[in-house]
Amino acid sequence: DLTEFQRNMKHFGVENNFPFPFMYYDLQKLYSKVYSDGKTRRSLKMAIEELGFSEDAEYHSAINDAVYTARIFQQMDFDSVKVYESIDTYRIPKDRKTEIYANFGTYEKYISRGFKTRDNAADDRVARSCRCYICGRSMKRLIKWFATTSKTYYSVFVCEEHGTFKGKLKVKHNDNGLYYD
Protein backbone atom coordinates (compact mmCIF):
# COMPACT_ATOMS: atom_id res chain seq x y z
CA ASP A 1 0.00 0.00 0.00
CA LEU A 2 1.56 3.23 -1.21
CA THR A 3 0.10 5.38 1.57
CA GLU A 4 1.43 3.09 4.30
CA PHE A 5 4.82 3.00 2.61
CA GLN A 6 5.00 6.82 2.67
CA ARG A 7 3.78 6.95 6.27
CA ASN A 8 6.59 4.58 7.21
CA MET A 9 9.09 6.72 5.30
CA LYS A 10 7.95 9.76 7.29
CA HIS A 11 8.02 7.86 10.59
CA PHE A 12 11.60 6.68 10.02
CA GLY A 13 12.80 10.05 8.70
CA VAL A 14 13.32 8.93 5.10
CA GLU A 15 12.98 11.83 2.66
CA ASN A 16 10.12 11.44 0.17
CA ASN A 17 11.74 12.05 -3.22
CA PHE A 18 8.81 10.80 -5.26
CA PRO A 19 7.83 13.26 -8.00
CA PHE A 20 4.79 15.48 -7.46
CA PRO A 21 2.24 14.61 -8.52
CA PHE A 22 3.18 10.96 -8.09
CA MET A 23 1.52 8.88 -10.80
CA TYR A 24 1.31 5.10 -10.48
CA TYR A 25 -0.61 2.09 -11.81
CA ASP A 26 -3.24 0.65 -9.47
CA LEU A 27 -3.37 -3.08 -10.20
CA GLN A 28 -6.88 -3.51 -8.79
CA LYS A 29 -8.28 -0.71 -10.96
CA LEU A 30 -6.53 -1.91 -14.13
CA TYR A 31 -7.42 -5.56 -13.50
CA SER A 32 -11.06 -4.54 -13.15
CA LYS A 33 -10.99 -2.60 -16.42
CA VAL A 34 -9.42 -5.53 -18.32
CA TYR A 35 -11.19 -8.51 -16.72
CA SER A 36 -14.37 -7.17 -15.09
CA ASP A 37 -16.74 -4.19 -15.08
CA GLY A 38 -14.19 -1.44 -14.41
CA LYS A 39 -15.61 -0.80 -10.94
CA THR A 40 -15.31 -4.05 -8.95
CA ARG A 41 -12.04 -4.39 -7.04
CA ARG A 42 -10.60 -7.89 -6.65
CA SER A 43 -8.06 -8.99 -4.05
CA LEU A 44 -4.65 -10.13 -5.27
CA LYS A 45 -5.53 -13.70 -4.26
CA MET A 46 -8.80 -13.62 -6.20
CA ALA A 47 -7.09 -12.22 -9.32
CA ILE A 48 -4.42 -14.96 -9.18
CA GLU A 49 -7.14 -17.62 -8.82
CA GLU A 50 -9.25 -16.16 -11.66
CA LEU A 51 -6.23 -16.17 -14.00
CA GLY A 52 -5.40 -19.75 -13.02
CA PHE A 53 -1.88 -19.02 -11.78
CA SER A 54 -0.26 -21.40 -9.32
CA GLU A 55 -0.29 -20.16 -5.74
CA ASP A 56 3.18 -21.21 -4.72
CA ALA A 57 3.88 -18.57 -2.06
CA GLU A 58 2.09 -16.99 0.92
CA TYR A 59 0.14 -13.77 0.42
CA HIS A 60 0.71 -10.55 2.41
CA SER A 61 4.48 -10.79 2.08
CA ALA A 62 5.99 -7.81 0.25
CA ILE A 63 8.21 -9.88 -2.05
CA ASN A 64 5.59 -12.56 -2.78
CA ASP A 65 2.87 -10.00 -3.45
CA ALA A 66 5.26 -8.15 -5.80
CA VAL A 67 5.86 -11.39 -7.73
CA TYR A 68 2.12 -12.10 -7.98
CA THR A 69 1.51 -8.50 -9.08
CA ALA A 70 4.17 -8.79 -11.80
CA ARG A 71 2.55 -12.01 -13.08
CA ILE A 72 -0.80 -10.28 -13.42
CA PHE A 73 0.70 -7.25 -15.19
CA GLN A 74 2.53 -9.61 -17.61
CA GLN A 75 -0.74 -11.39 -18.42
CA MET A 76 -3.01 -8.38 -18.93
CA ASP A 77 -3.38 -6.26 -22.06
CA PHE A 78 -1.57 -3.32 -20.48
CA ASP A 79 -1.69 -1.16 -23.62
CA SER A 80 -5.49 -1.05 -23.38
CA VAL A 81 -5.39 0.46 -19.86
CA LYS A 82 -2.08 2.31 -19.50
CA VAL A 83 -3.87 5.65 -19.90
CA TYR A 84 -5.57 5.03 -16.53
CA GLU A 85 -2.77 6.15 -14.25
CA SER A 86 -3.67 6.80 -10.62
CA ILE A 87 -2.59 9.88 -8.71
CA ASP A 88 -1.15 9.38 -5.24
CA THR A 89 -2.73 11.78 -2.74
CA TYR A 90 -0.55 11.18 0.31
CA ARG A 91 0.90 14.58 -0.57
CA ILE A 92 -1.69 17.03 -1.86
CA PRO A 93 -1.15 20.35 -3.66
CA LYS A 94 0.09 23.15 -1.39
CA ASP A 95 -1.70 25.97 -3.21
CA ARG A 96 -4.03 26.80 -6.11
CA LYS A 97 -1.10 26.92 -8.58
CA THR A 98 -0.10 23.30 -7.93
CA GLU A 99 -3.60 21.80 -8.04
CA ILE A 100 -3.79 18.76 -10.29
CA TYR A 101 -5.89 18.46 -13.44
CA ALA A 102 -5.63 15.13 -15.29
CA ASN A 103 -7.54 14.08 -18.40
CA PHE A 104 -7.88 10.32 -18.93
CA GLY A 105 -9.74 10.44 -22.25
CA THR A 106 -13.09 9.32 -20.84
CA TYR A 107 -13.10 11.46 -17.70
CA GLU A 108 -11.13 14.17 -15.95
CA LYS A 109 -9.77 14.24 -12.40
CA TYR A 110 -9.06 17.26 -10.22
CA ILE A 111 -7.16 17.26 -6.91
CA SER A 112 -7.40 20.45 -4.88
CA ARG A 113 -5.14 22.03 -2.33
CA GLY A 114 -5.95 21.37 1.33
CA PHE A 115 -8.67 23.13 3.32
CA LYS A 116 -9.10 23.36 7.09
CA THR A 117 -12.70 22.12 7.03
CA ARG A 118 -14.76 19.64 5.02
CA ASP A 119 -17.28 22.40 4.23
CA ASN A 120 -14.59 24.70 2.82
CA ALA A 121 -13.35 21.90 0.55
CA ALA A 122 -16.88 21.04 -0.60
CA ASP A 123 -17.75 24.71 -1.24
CA ASP A 124 -14.63 25.53 -3.29
CA ARG A 125 -15.71 27.21 -6.52
CA VAL A 126 -13.08 25.44 -8.65
CA ALA A 127 -14.04 22.01 -7.31
CA ARG A 128 -17.73 22.74 -7.94
CA SER A 129 -17.17 23.94 -11.50
CA CYS A 130 -16.89 21.39 -14.27
CA ARG A 131 -15.18 21.38 -17.65
CA CYS A 132 -15.96 19.07 -20.55
CA TYR A 133 -13.22 16.43 -20.64
CA ILE A 134 -13.53 16.31 -24.46
CA CYS A 135 -13.25 19.98 -25.45
CA GLY A 136 -12.13 21.58 -22.19
CA ARG A 137 -14.88 24.23 -22.12
CA SER A 138 -16.72 25.18 -18.96
CA MET A 139 -20.08 23.46 -18.68
CA LYS A 140 -23.40 24.74 -17.37
CA ARG A 141 -24.72 23.06 -14.24
CA LEU A 142 -28.21 21.56 -14.73
CA ILE A 143 -28.70 20.12 -11.24
CA LYS A 144 -27.35 21.65 -8.04
CA TRP A 145 -24.73 19.65 -6.20
CA PHE A 146 -26.31 17.22 -3.73
CA ALA A 147 -24.72 14.93 -1.17
CA THR A 148 -25.30 11.19 -0.95
CA THR A 149 -22.94 10.86 2.02
CA SER A 150 -20.94 13.36 4.07
CA LYS A 151 -18.07 12.85 1.62
CA THR A 152 -19.61 12.44 -1.84
CA TYR A 153 -21.52 14.99 -3.91
CA TYR A 154 -23.06 14.71 -7.39
CA SER A 155 -24.30 17.13 -10.02
CA VAL A 156 -25.24 17.14 -13.70
CA PHE A 157 -23.61 19.44 -16.24
CA VAL A 158 -24.12 20.10 -19.93
CA CYS A 159 -21.60 20.92 -22.64
CA GLU A 160 -23.20 22.67 -25.63
CA GLU A 161 -21.19 20.48 -28.00
CA HIS A 162 -20.93 17.11 -26.21
CA GLY A 163 -24.10 16.78 -24.12
CA THR A 164 -24.70 15.94 -20.46
CA PHE A 165 -22.20 14.68 -17.90
CA LYS A 166 -22.29 13.55 -14.30
CA GLY A 167 -20.09 15.50 -11.91
CA LYS A 168 -18.74 13.76 -8.81
CA LEU A 169 -16.96 15.50 -5.97
CA LYS A 170 -15.44 13.46 -3.16
CA VAL A 171 -14.05 15.23 -0.09
CA LYS A 172 -11.18 13.35 1.54
CA HIS A 173 -9.06 13.89 4.66
CA ASN A 174 -5.27 13.56 4.73
CA ASP A 175 -2.76 12.74 7.48
CA ASN A 176 -2.04 16.44 8.03
CA GLY A 177 -5.64 17.18 9.03
CA LEU A 178 -6.55 18.90 5.76
CA TYR A 179 -9.54 18.23 3.52
CA TYR A 180 -9.26 18.10 -0.26
CA ASP A 181 -11.39 17.30 -3.31
Residue ranges of predicted features:
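DEDD superfamily 3′-5′ metal-dependent exonuclease/proofreading module
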Residues: 1-181
